[in-house]
């Protein structure tokens, strides 16, 4: 099918269904039995200033080997949620944050320094600027996952 498709009522699909382009859903999407939804994870290793592209993924992973700065993400959408996984390598890595990241109490968290420590920043985009970069991103970090 290479054009607009509208399904009214109940629709079922067996096998693999790939949708590209804009997709709109009205009503409910229900996953049953052994179904699962997975979100693409993007590696961002080896970059000191990281501007995540929120248009290609919601979840991100990086190994922190030096001083990294989380810059303003591009292609953000209001209401978008996700996680940024940070893995400490050697204990010398550090994270700083662009001012668009808003943490509880107004204080950015300190990144765990134990070798192999995993920290997770969960976020929701509260507002964006006119160029679709994140303007206010509410974030919280949990640390020291083993």
Q: What is the role of each PLM region?
A:
Residues 71-72, 108-112:
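Beta-strand-rich interaction surfaces with strong enrichment in secreted/lumenal proteins
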Residues 23-103, 116-118, 124-146:
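Exposed extracellular interaction/assembly regions and N-terminal maturation sites
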Residues 1-33:
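Register-specific beta-strand positions within repetitive beta-rich fiber domains
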Residues 1, 9, 110-112, 129:
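Serine/threonine-rich low-complexity intrinsically disordered regions
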């Amino acid at each position: 099918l290479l054009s607009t498709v509208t399904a009214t009522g109940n629709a079922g699909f067996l096998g693999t269904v790939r949708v590209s382009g804009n997709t709109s859903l009205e009503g409910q999407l229900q996953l049953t039995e052994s179904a699962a939804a997975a979100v693409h994870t993007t590696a961002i290793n080896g970059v000191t200033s990281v501007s995540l592209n929120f248009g290609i993924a919601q979840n991100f992973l990086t190994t922190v080997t030096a001083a990294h700065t989380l810059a303003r993400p591009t292609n953000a959408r209001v209401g978008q949620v996700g996680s940024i996984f940070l893995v400490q390598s050697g204990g010398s890595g550090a994270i700083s944050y662009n001012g668009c990241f808003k943490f509880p109490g107004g204080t950015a968290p300190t990144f765990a320094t134990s070798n192999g420590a995993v920290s997770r920043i969960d976020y929701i985009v509260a507002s964006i600027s006119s160029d679709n970069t994140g303007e206010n991103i509410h974030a919280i970090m949990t640390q020291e996952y083993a």
